[in-house]
């Protein structure tokens, strides 16, 4: 991470989601980064001086609940990913609750699609509904980080 951002920018952009609060990970998010997505988030170990990237995620955030729009975009990207990852195991999980948000937003849910690599790391594409707003998130994470976010 330090090859791309300085320590001050990383520190000033820390944004910890509820599923990472009690973990050994944190993340920094950068808005308006790139042309295709309006936000990227990069997770790393809290006490790591090297700030090795454990997950990278790009997001398109919608200011309202537009799940149908998100799902259409998700399906389009999924078709591209299925060509890129044709030898990987693909799983469409259906609608799942976001357990880490159940106290703040009991209706929070998402529709993940994953591609699993040989080392059990994953690429994931999902449409999320949180606080009546929709977000498309696409990312790649290693196995160790995956175990934390699957809880």
Residue ranges and their predicted role:
Residues 75-150:
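A charged, solvent-exposed segment within the mature domains of Sec-exported extracytoplasmic proteins
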Residues 1-52:
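N-terminal leader/targeting segments
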Residues 23, 35, 63-64, 121:
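Processing junctions and N-termini across compartments
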Residues 10, 14-16, 40-42, 53-56, ...:
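Weak global preference for isoleucine
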